[in-house]
C-alpha cells in the first residue's frame, strides 16, 4: 500500500514549530512528511539545537527521506527570523504555508495537513484591516468552503469532541441549541466511521449542568434541548448514550467501549483529555473534506531554539493522520 503523504506546516517561525518539525527526521513514521517552511530557517534552527538533520527538497515523485533526513517544501520567510521574537511581517508567510498545503491537497499531492502552532495575535496585528483571524480551523474551513467543522482532541485512547468551542462560559448555555447538537453529533459520527474506520461508533454525551440537570432541578438544558436532540439522532441510527454528568462520564468504567465523548463546552472536556494524554494530545478537525490534525499546544516562544521543546504532540498528530488515512480507505 502506498504511503500517505502529509503537508506539515511549520507554523510561527519564531516559536517551537521549526524545532519540533526537525524531530520528524528521526521519528520512523509510516508515511512521508513534507515540512512546509523556510529551509534556511530550519537549517539555522538545526544548527542552534545541535541536530544533525539533512534537509532535502520535497519531490512528490521521489521515494521519500531516509532516517535523519527531512523533506522540505521551501517557502521563504518575509523577513529574517529571531527565535522567541514575533515579527508581524512574517504573518503573511505563516498563512502562505497553509495556502500551499491546501493547494497540494487540491492537486492530489498531499493526503492531509498536520499543523504546528501559529500565533493568532501576531497574525491579527498584521491584518487588522482585512478581518479577524480566528485560527487554523476556521481558516481551513473557509478556504475549503466547509460550512461547519467540529473540534475533537484525542490522546491515549480518549477522544473528546465539543459542541461549543471558544466561548465565554456565560454564553455557553444560550449557544447550545438542539440543531447545533444534532449537526455536531452527525459530523462526529460520520468522521468516526469514514475517517477512523469505526463501523458503529459509540458516543457518550455529557450533560451541561451538574448531575446532568438532576431531572430539571439544576437546569433545563438537558430536558429541553439535549435529550430531544439525542432522541432524534438515535432515530437516525446514531449510537449515543447519555446525557451523563461529566464527573461520572470520564470514569474508566464509563469510557470502556466508547469511541468518543461529546462534551458541551471547552473546559468541560479538554482539561480531562489534556491531563489524560500528558502532552501527547492531538487536535483533529472533523467535517473538512481532507484530514487535518494538529498539536494541542501553542508556540512556546520562550522555548524556541533552547532544546527544551517536546515534539511528542506533533509526532502523535502525524501518527493520528496516518490512522485516519488508513481508516478512510
UniProtKB/Swiss-Prot annotation:
InterPro entries in the cross-refs: PdxA, PdxA_fam
Which cofactor does the UniProt annotation name?
Answer: Zn(2+); Mg(2+); Co(2+)
Matching entries from Pfam families are given as:
PdxA
Catalysed transformations (reactions) = 4-(phosphooxy)-L-threonine + NAD(+) = 3-amino-2-oxopropyl phosphate + CO2 + NADH
Q: Name one GO molecular function term.
A: cobalt ion binding
The keyword Cytoplasm belongs to this UniProt entry's keyword annotation:
yes
**Which residues pair up as cystines?**
none
Job of this protein: Catalyzes the NAD(P)-dependent oxidation of 4-(phosphooxy)-L-threonine (HTP) into 2-amino-3-oxo-4-(phosphooxy)butyric acid which spontaneously decarboxylates to form 3-amino-2-oxopropyl phosphate (AHAP).
Q: What else is known?
A: The active site is located at the dimer interface.
Stated family: Belongs to the PdxA family.
Q: How does it assemble?
A: Homodimer.
NCBIfam families, A to Z: pdxA (TIGR00557)
Protein name as catalogued: 4-hydroxythreonine-4-phosphate dehydrogenase
The organism is Neisseria meningitidis serogroup B (strain ATCC BAA-335 / MC58)
Question: Quick one: which gene encodes this?
Answer: pdxA
Amino acid at each position: 500500500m502506498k504511503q500517505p503523504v502529509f503537508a506539515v506546516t511549520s507554523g510561527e517561525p519564531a516559536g517551537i514549530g521549526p524545532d519540533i518539525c526537525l524531530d520528524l527526521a528521526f521519528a520512523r513514521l509510516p508515511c512521508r512528511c513534507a515540512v512546509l517552511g523556510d529551509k534556511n530557517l530550519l537549517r539555522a534552527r538545526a544548527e542552534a539545537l545541535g541536530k544533525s538533520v539533512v534537509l532535502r527538497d520535497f519531490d512528490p515523485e521521489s521515494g521519500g527521506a531516509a532516517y535523519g533526513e527531512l523533506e522540505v517544501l521551501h517557502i521563504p520567510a518575509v523577513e529574517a527570523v529571531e527565535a522567541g521574537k514575533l515579527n508581524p511581517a512574517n504573518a503573511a508567510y505563516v498563512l502562505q504555508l497553509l495556502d500551499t498545503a491546501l493547494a497540494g491537497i487540491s492537486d492530489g499531492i498531499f493526503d492531509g495537513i498536520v499543523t504546528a502552532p501559529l500565533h493568532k495575535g501576531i497574525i491579527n496585528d498584521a491584518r487588522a484591516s482585512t478581518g479577524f483571524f480566528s485560527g487554523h480551523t476556521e481558516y481551513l474551513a473557509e478556504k475549503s468552503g466547509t460550512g461547519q467543522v467540529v473540534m475533537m482532541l484525542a490522546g491515549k485512547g480518549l477522544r473528546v469532541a465539543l459542541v461549543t468551542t471558544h466561548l465565554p462560559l456565560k454564553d455557553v448555555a444560550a449557544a447550545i441549541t438542539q440543531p447545533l447538537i444534532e449537526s455536531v453529533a452527525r459530523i462526529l459520527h460520520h468522521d468516526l466511521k469514514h475517517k477512523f474506520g469505526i463501523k458503529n461508533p459509540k458516543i457518550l454525551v455529557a450533560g451541561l449542568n451538574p448531575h446532568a440537570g438532576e431531572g430539571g432541578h439544576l437546569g433545563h438544558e438537558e430536558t429541553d434541548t439535549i435529550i430531544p436532540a439525542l432522541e432524534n439522532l438515535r432515530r437516525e441510527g446514531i449510537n449515543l448514550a447519555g446525557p451523563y454528568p461529566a464527573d461520572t462520564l470520564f470514569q474508566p468504567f464509563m469510557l470502556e467501549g466508547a469511541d468518543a465523548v461529546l462534551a458541551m463546552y471547552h473546559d468541560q472536556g479538554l482539561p480531562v483529555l489534556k491531563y489524560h494524554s500528558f502532552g501527547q494530545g492531538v487536535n483533529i478537525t472533523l467535517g473538512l473534506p481532507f484530514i487535518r490534525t494538529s498539536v494541542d499546544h501553542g508556540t512556546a516562544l520562550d522555548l524556541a531554539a533552547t532544546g527544551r521543546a517536546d515534539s511528542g504532540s506533533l509526532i502523535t498528530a502525524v501518527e493520528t493522520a496516518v490512522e485516519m488515512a488508513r481508516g478512510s480507505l
